[in-house]
Design a protein with these regions (language model features):
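Alpha-helical tetratricopeptide repeat
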Residues: 3-136
Length: 136
């Protein structure tokens, strides 16, 4: 009985990993709606994983759903605040909504995590220009 339960548990883990991989493949081939469907299935099973939240945020961004992308990226950040790409995605989603001050805050955090990425610095400067904060 114990052996059967361990096989079922291992199989469930494999299926979630497979769903994430399938969603990322669909994302790679620009099939954003299909990728969202895969990530929705993963999130229904394991909402505590940060990666499907991030991947779904990417898909929503490419579908011009910037509010949904920001929301999913926020959830991914809540689950794992150490990935600078999530802050970048949320900042870009906020820029598209003209939430420049929030985007600056995201870029501040991304720069703290990885100061060698020049696009973080440039995008933060562009946000500050839009806010007319020329002294910073």
């Amino acid at each position: 009985m114990v052996a059967l339960l361990s096989v079922v548990k291992a199989n469930a883990q494999y299926n979630v990993d497979r769903l994430i991989m399938n969603g990322e493949v669909a994302l790679h081939y620009d099939d954003y709606v299909l990728s969202i469907q895969y990530f929705n299935k993963v999130l229904a099973l394991k909402p505590y994983l940060w990666l499907p939240w991030y991947d779904r945020a990417v898909a929503k961004f490419y579908l011009d759903d910037y509010i949904g992308s920001e929301s999913d990226a926020t959830k991914a950040i809540d689950l794992n605040p150490y990935i600078e790409q999530i802050f970048d995605l949320r900042a870009i989603s906020r820029i598209r909504q003209e939430k420049y001050q929030d985007a600056v805050s995201d870029y501040d955090r991304a720069i703290r995590l990885n100061p060698s990425v020049s696009s973080f610095w440039v995008n933060r400067a562009i946000c500050r220009m839009n806010l007319q904060e020329f002294d910073q």
